[in-house]
Regions:
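Conserved class I S-adenosyl-L-methionine
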Residues: 1-35, 46, 63-66, 119-152, 175, 179, 183, ...
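Local beta-strand N-terminus motif with an aromatic residue
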Residues: 34, 90-91
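Class I SAM-dependent methyltransferase SAM/SAH-binding core
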Residues: 38-82
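A conserved beta-strand element that flanks and buttresses the S-adenosyl-L-methionine
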Residues: 94
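Short catalytic micro-motifs in class I SAM-dependent methyltransferases
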Residues: 97-101
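A short glycine-rich, Lys/Arg-flanked "PGG" loop and its adjoining helix->strand segment in the class I
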Residues: 106-120
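Conserved Class I S-adenosyl-L-methionine
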Residues: 163-249
């Protein structure tokens, strides 16, 4: 997805893609020792840890315009594949649910390695669980995003040895990415919510799935089949924190 695409689908990111504090805690723990951090594909600035010197890189002017001004933060309109910085400029790099939007993820990671002295933190996704109910209504999600996100094995070909941590998604997740509303099915009927989830912009014949979901919620079929999910507090939907550290080498 290009910066021009995000100038359209990213219009409500700041209100709908608010960082979830439980996910933030996991990300920030890995960045604790870094003083200077580059946030690649920074979007509106979600998950940037406080108290650090942040350099945010984002190609979309629409996303940049939604950022809240923060102390010790500098924003550059640039792409992951061509970072305008000298080698070893930053202690660490972070890239949060962004790598699938890069035009060349291998080059983007090579650039991250070049400008970073130590850690690279990726929050990414490794594929849809077989039993996630959303694929009943939008079967395309099983492969649309999976073809865009590199696998852990592919990431390792560029990053070398990595540490991988599962990140379960809370039932009341405040960051409105694709699986965030797994326990709140009516949310997917809201076009504004869908507008902040890039996956939906790539699904053909979207209204067919919306209509079926609306019907199943109205007649109780969804609750008969999946109502048990609403008693769970969190669920693993394939989101992972991947950490590359030059000290691993």
């Amino acid at each position: 997805m290009t910066s021009a695409d995000f100038d359209i689908v990213g219009q409500h990111y700041s209100s709908l893609r608010r960082p979830d504090p439980r996910i933030a805690k996991i990300i920030h723990a890995e960045l604790m020792d870094a003083e200077s951090i580059i946030n690649i594909g920074a979007g509106t600035g979600s998950y940037e840890p406080p108290g650090k010197t942040i350099t945010a890189v984002e190609p979309s002017e629409t996303m940049i315009a939604q950022r809240v001004d923060k102390e010790n933060t500098t924003v550059f309109c640039a792409s992951a594949e061509n970072l305008p910085f000298e080698s070893n400029s930053f202690d660490a790099a972070m890239a949060i649910l962004t790598i699938h939007h890069w035009s060349n993820w291998q080059k983007g990671l090579q650039e991250a390695l070049r400008v970073t002295k130590s850690k690279i933190i990726l929050f990414t996704w490794i594929g849809m669980p077989e039993k996630f109910w959303l694929s009943d209504y939008f079967p395309e999600i099983k492969y649309i995003d999976k073809d865009l996100f590199p696998s852990l094995e592919q990431l390792s070909t560029v990053l070398g040895d990595v540490k991988v941590t599962s990140v379960p998604i809370p039932k009341d997740c405040t960051d409105g990415f694709m699986c965030a509303y797994w326990s709140r099915p009516t949310s997917y009927l809201d076009s504004r919510i869908r507008s902040a989830i890039s996956t939906f912009s790539r699904i053909p014949n979207l209204e067919k799935g919306i209509t079926k979901l609306k019907q199943d919620l109205a007649n109780g079929k969804w609750f008969e089949k999946y109502g048990y999910l609403q008693s769970l507090h969190e669920f693993d939907f394939g989101y992972r924190l991947v950490v590359s550290d030059k000290q691993f080498a």
